Regions:
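ATP-dependent carboxylate activation and anion-phosphoryl transfer catalytic cores
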Residues: 1-217
């Protein structure tokens, strides 16, 4: 859930955070990543069978990168990514799946800054977004992924028409927060996850309040 992660905006903050960590956990390993300000975060779920990679969905976050993906509002399909960027995302996922020799579900988190795609992390497992994409698309993704892990090929499911999404318009994953149950928790969103659940909304157009609301917060 992003526990222990911090965003530092200058060298002094980096030094302060590092010292605080070392004071609490002497000898602890620390990972420093470059933070891309005002970047767009992307979640990609896919299923790999060793021969091909099926991208079940590319989700674009409304909140800027830096907010934990579990606390972000995600839109399926993406609403402002160019065809070129989406093609790059697809190629990166395929290359990662091949390098990892992935079989079954693979989640890749990325950010896009100035039309350049960066990979944050790749997880060869089910992610929290799989149920969202499955419900949004009407495709039994967990079942298909399980059968693929047991040896079946994606081509079999494609021939049966099982990989075709029936989503019309957009599906929006909205985080649910239980601030009333945890009043002591700061309400500012950041790299540590604070949501306790998720809801899904289906909209026909991006003028819908479900899409516009996060921009107004």
């Amino acid at each position: 859930g992003g526990q222990g992660m911090r965003i530092a905006i200058n060298r002094d903050e980096v030094a302060e955070y590092v010292q605080n960590i070392l004071d609490l956990f002497p000898g602890n390993q620390i990972l420093l990543d470059r933070f891309l300000e005002d970047a767009v975060e992307i979640d990609v779920d896919s299923v790999c069978d060793g021969d091909e990679v099926w991208l079940t969905g590319i989700m674009q976050h409304i909140e800027p990168a830096g907010v934990h993906s579990g606390d972000s509002t995600a839109v399926l399909p993406p609403f402002s990514l160019s065809d070129e960027v989406q093609a790059t995302i697809r190629r990166y996922v395929e290359d990662i799946a091949d390098a990892l020799d992935a079989k079954g579900l693979l989640n890749v988190q990325m950010v896009v800054k100035d039309n350049v795609v960066y990979v944050i992390e790749a997880n060869p497992r089910a992610s929290r977004t799989v149920p969202f994409v499955a419900k949004a698309s009407g495709i039994p993704i967990p079942s298909i992924a399980t059968k693929v892990m047991l040896g079946e090929k994606l081509a079999t499911f494609r021939e049966q028409g099982m990989l075709e999404s029936d989503l019309e318009g957009y599906a929006i994953k909205e985080p649910v927060f239980s601030w009333d149950k945890f009043p002591e928790v700061p309400k500012e969103l950041g790299p540590e996850m604070k949501s306790t659940g998720e809801a899904i909304a289906f909209v026909d157009a991006l003028t819908d309040d479900h899409f516009q609301r996060p921009f107004e917060m």
